[in-house]
């Protein structure tokens, strides 16, 4: 999936002019139209392969399914809540974001919110504008010596931590992915959630909105917090249960809250916004000139680099595709797809478990990107759905009734060939096993069911191969096969045979085109199949 045919991009939200310029300088056609209805968006996408949005455009399943040419959706920002990821993935559409673009702006807003909560600056400003001079009402608290709990220690959480440490705050945090050692490297003591609640004077959330993070702060967790805790949410509406927050504010369990995001935007229920101890903004986390310019620039560069085959970054729904752009991994992706195509041609439409096994130091972590490529080869011929690719392979293989396992064989130290990088694809419990490798940048078939090819058989994209197994003692076999090719009007381009395995070698013929039928062939050989990937 090289995206070489991605030629036209629609920008449907307001972005910095640098975005359009970078795309055009990269050879892409660009259309900019904003405030489109769903119907207008679908109409505009009919001749566009790419779409770039901010948060206003809703890329729903209806839009995705109606956009026949759409290949890539780019989100100029971090959150992809406005893109139906499941629908995009099912259709094989790549979704990208710019995770670095607005990190600093979001972190700075969070820090500003913490300071405003501590000193009630917005409330005091409103009082002054109302003609009042009320010094006693707005008694604040120092940040120095207070404990800040940071839930989510990604880019934004880290930036918040280092800035608030400068105010003398002690920073503790929680992140299921970041290790305690990494957290400690930027001054955060990582603790379990149940230990964080009673410790913190301030809590700020910086997680994506997932089922596991929805309502992370709720009636139960507020009850475990220190009385008078202050809460900041500049991440995603819904991470803090808004009803529970209001009850905590009303009871005094929560002394104040700063909200840049809401479950519904704009919020129709004004109870939180109107509460005197709540500071609120209309989702301004990324609303700085620098962030908008950075996000527009980053997503445009990502599109151009992708089209030119240089690199792929910011991928949300297809990590395997990122690896496909690596110079080392790219030929192995091609081998994996070829092996999957071979396996489908050989075993028919297999059911059960396909085993994908890597061997060799450089392939230690490659299984997760190679197995989707094997699936692409397996399903591409059999699937009656949309094109199978590295984006939707894992989703579609389950629906095809197949289970795919991935493992790594480190080899036995000192054993001959143990350091060789190999890819094995096999159907569990059935006599179908193929082993391949990469020579230079060329995928090669090394073995079929233990029968070794010396030299290996090149697996070149677009090159039809006929594979068959026959008795080694039949001297008339090869002339008969060549005669059958001539009758079908197919030229023989190459021919290789394996070493004898169980008395029967495998033969591989490179052909000018696939044969119309193998029925006649199967009368002369023990087994035969053909494929082209």
Swiss-Prot record:
Sequence positions that bind NAD(+): 78, 155-156, 175, 207, 234-236, 260, 283-286
Residues recorded with modification Phosphothreonine: 78
GO terms (BP aspect): G1 to G0 transition; gamma-aminobutyric acid metabolic process; glial cell development; glutamine metabolic process; glycine metabolic process; L-serine biosynthetic process; L-serine metabolic process; neural tube development
EC number: 1.1.1.95
N6-acetyllysine found at: 21, 58
Pathway note: Amino-acid biosynthesis; L-serine biosynthesis; L-serine from 3-phospho-D-glycerate: step 1/3
Covalent cross-link (Glycyl lysine isopeptide (Lys-Gly) (interchain with G-Cter in SUMO2)), residues: 21
Class of this enzyme: oxidoreductase
Catalytic site positions: 236, 265, 283
Catalytic activity: (2R)-3-phosphoglycerate + NAD(+) = 3-phosphooxypyruvate + NADH + H(+)
Entry keyword set: Acetylation, Amino-acid biosynthesis, Isopeptide bond, NAD, Oxidoreductase, Phosphoprotein, Serine biosynthesis, Ubl conjugation
Annotated Gene Ontology cellular component terms: myelin sheath
Phenotypic effect of disruption: Decreased level of free serine, glycine, taurine, GABA, glutamine, and threonine in spinal cord and head. Impaired central nervous system (CNS) with shorter neural tube length and overall growth retardation. Severe atrophy at the thoracic level, particularly in the dorsal spinal cord. Poorly developed dorsal horn and adjacent mantle zone. Neurons fail to develop neurites, particularly commissural axonal fibers.
Family (UniProt): Belongs to the D-isomer specific 2-hydroxyacid dehydrogenase family.
Function: Catalyzes the reversible oxidation of 3-phospho-D-glycerate to 3-phosphonooxypyruvate, the first step of the phosphorylated L-serine biosynthesis pathway. Does not catalyze the reversible oxidation of 2-hydroxyglutarate to 2-oxoglutarate and the reversible oxidation of (S)-malate to oxaloacetate.
Name this polypeptide is given: D-3-phosphoglycerate dehydrogenase
């Amino acid at each position: 999936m090289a995206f070489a045919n991605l030629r036209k991009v629609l920008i449907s939200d307001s972005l910095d002019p640098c975005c359009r310029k970078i795309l055009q300088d990269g050879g892409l056609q660009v259309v900019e139209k904003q405030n489109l209805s769903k119907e207008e968006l679908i109409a505009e996408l009919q001749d566009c392969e790419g779409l770039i949005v901010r948060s206003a455009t809703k890329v729903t399943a209806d839009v995705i399914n109606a956009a026949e040419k759409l290949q890539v959706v780019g989100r100029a920002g971090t959150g992809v809540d406005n893109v139906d990821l499941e629908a995009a993935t099912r259709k094989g559409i790549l979704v990208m974001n710019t995770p670095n673009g607005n990190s600093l702006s979001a972190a700075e807003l969070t820090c500003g919110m913490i300071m405003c909560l501590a000193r009630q600056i917005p409330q005091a400003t409103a009082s002054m504008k109302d003609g009042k001079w009320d010094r006693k009402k707005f008694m604040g608290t120092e940040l120095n010596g207070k404990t800040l709990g940071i839930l989510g220690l990604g880019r934004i959480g880290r930036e918040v931590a280092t800035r608030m440490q400068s105010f003398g705050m002690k920073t503790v945090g929680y992140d299921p992915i970041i290790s305690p050692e990494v957290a400690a490297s930027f001054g955060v003591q990582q603790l379990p959630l149940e230990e964080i609640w009673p410790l913190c004077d301030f809590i700020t959330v910086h997680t994506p909105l997932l089922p596991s993070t929805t309502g992370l702060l709720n009636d139960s967790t507020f009850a475990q917090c220190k009385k008078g805790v202050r809460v900041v949410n500049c991440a995603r509406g819904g991470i803090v249960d808004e009803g529970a927050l209001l009850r905590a504010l009303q009871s005094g369990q929560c002394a104040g809250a700063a909200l840049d995001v809401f479950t519904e935007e704009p919020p129709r229920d004004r109870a939180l916004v109107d509460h005197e101890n709540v500071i609120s903004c209309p989702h301004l986390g990324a609303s700085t000139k620098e962030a908008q310019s950075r996000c527009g620039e980053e997503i445009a560069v990502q599109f151009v680099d992708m089209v030119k085959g240089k690199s792929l970054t910011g991928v949300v729904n297809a990590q395997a595709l990122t690896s496909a752009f690596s110079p080392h991994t790219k030929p192995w992706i091609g081998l994996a797809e070829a092996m999957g195509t071979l396996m489908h041609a050989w075993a028919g439409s297999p059911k059960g478990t396909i085993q994908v096994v890597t061997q060799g130091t450089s392939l230690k972590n490659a299984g997760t990107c190679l197995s989707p490529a094997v699936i692409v080869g397996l399903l591409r011929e059999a699937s009656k759905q949309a094109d199978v690719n590295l984006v939707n392979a894992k989703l579609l293989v389950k629906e095809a009734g197949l289970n795919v396992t991935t493992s790594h064989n480190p080899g036995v130290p000192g054993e001959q060939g143990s350091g060789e990088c190999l890819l094995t694809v096999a159907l569990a419990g059935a006599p179908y096993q193929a082993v391949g490798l990469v020579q230079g940048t060329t995928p090669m078939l090394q073995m079929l069911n233990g029968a070794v090819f010396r030299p290996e058989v090149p697996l070149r994209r677009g090159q039809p191969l006929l594979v068959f197994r026959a008795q080694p003692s039949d001297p008339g076999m090869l002339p008969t096969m060549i005669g059958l090719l001539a009758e079908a009007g197919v030229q023989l381009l190459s021919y290789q045979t394996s070493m004898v395995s169980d008395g029967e070698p495998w033969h591989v013929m490179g052909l000018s085109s696939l044969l119309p039928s193998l029925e006649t062939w199967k009368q002369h050989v023990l087994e035969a199949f053909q494929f082209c990937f």
